């Protein structure tokens, strides 16, 4: 299976055989409560991600993050106090047949009732942006998920981005795009009216998700991209390694990067953009001169 992964892809190998489903579900609320479930609930409460009457499309890629997210949503539905509905949607963007079957088998074992649909995104993204197809692929996949969520009458689309994805995005924008912009816990779609993206794994560290999956005995989809399997290099992996190396010299650097987006002092920046309009620190001087 590792032959299907890209050169920079992390291969997550289970510790043992698959554990019984009930044991896996119990571990979310017990063994991994502090590191996964509690942070899932905190993000939902802090950012009001799940509200009365919501119909949430939970995006299932088959990777470690989306599988855990799906199971936690099922537990929230079972034990929570808010009335909401769930749809589990899984897209095949051009997986190898073995990868597609692994996705189906895992979801059947975990009793995640996915609605699987096809989209030839990998091939199209590679043709449009062959040098670096990842960005184009992500946009196309997002659009396909939006379409499916809308088709099912959902008002929210849940994605499995976690804490490490958030800080890596912040650093990618800073170092590669020259801007300060992070990944938000929720945002309204600009192209699909009435649909909101939510990210309930916002506070959960990737290492906690990996430990949960390995202990469960589940072999998740690792890098299932048939395009990445032929490519070398990925800026996100470089940023991930950079943050790790910074952690050797700066205490809790990950938390500092995360908190930076909560503590932006507009009086001390040269410029910013809000609602599509550019602003400059010079604007206040022009007002004073009038």
Predicted regions and their residues:
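Catalytic subdomain that performs nucleotidyl-dependent activation
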Residues: 85-86, 164-238, 242-245
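Short, solvent-exposed coil/turn elements at secondary-structure transition points
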Residues: 92-94, 120-122, 189, 203, ...
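Short, basic, helix/turn surface patches
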Residues: 138-152, 186-192, 243-260
């Amino acid at each position: 299976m590792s032959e299907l992964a890209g050169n920079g892809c992390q291969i997550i190998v289970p510790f043992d055989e698959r554990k019984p489903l009930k044991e896996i579900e119990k571990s979310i609320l017990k063994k991994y409560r502090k590191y996964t479930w509690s942070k899932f609930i905190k993000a939902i409460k802090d950012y009001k991600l799940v509200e009365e009457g919501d119909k949430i499309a939970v995006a299932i890629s088959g990777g470690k993050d989306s599988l855990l997210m799906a199971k936690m949503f099922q537990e929230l539905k079972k034990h929570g106090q808010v009335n909401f509905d769930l749809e589990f949607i899984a897209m095949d963007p051009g997986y190898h047949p073995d990868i597609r079957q692994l996705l189906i088998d895992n979801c059947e074992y975990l009793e995640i009732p996915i609605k699987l649909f096809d989209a030839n995104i990998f091939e199209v993204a590679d043709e449009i942006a062959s040098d670096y197809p990842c960005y184009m692929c992500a946009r196309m996949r997002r659009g396909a998920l939006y379409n499916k969520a809308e088709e099912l009458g959902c008002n929210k689309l849940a994605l499995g981005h976690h804490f490490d994805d958030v800080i890596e995005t912040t650093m990618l924008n800073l170092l590669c795009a020259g801007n300060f912009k992070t990944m938000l816990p929720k945002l309204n779609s600009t192209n699909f009216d009435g649909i909101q993206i939510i990210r309930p794994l916002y506070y959960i560290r990737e290492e906690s998700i990996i430990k949960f999956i390995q202990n469960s005995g589940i072999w998740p989809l690792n890098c299932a991209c048939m395009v990445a399997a032929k490519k070398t290099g990925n800026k996100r992996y470089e940023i991930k390694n950079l943050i790790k190396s910074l952690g050797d010299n700066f205490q809790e650097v990950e938390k500092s990067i995360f908190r930076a987006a909560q503590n932006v002092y507009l009086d001390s920046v040269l410029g910013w953009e809000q609602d599509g309009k550019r602003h400059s620190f010079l604007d206040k001087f022009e007002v004073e001169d009038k």
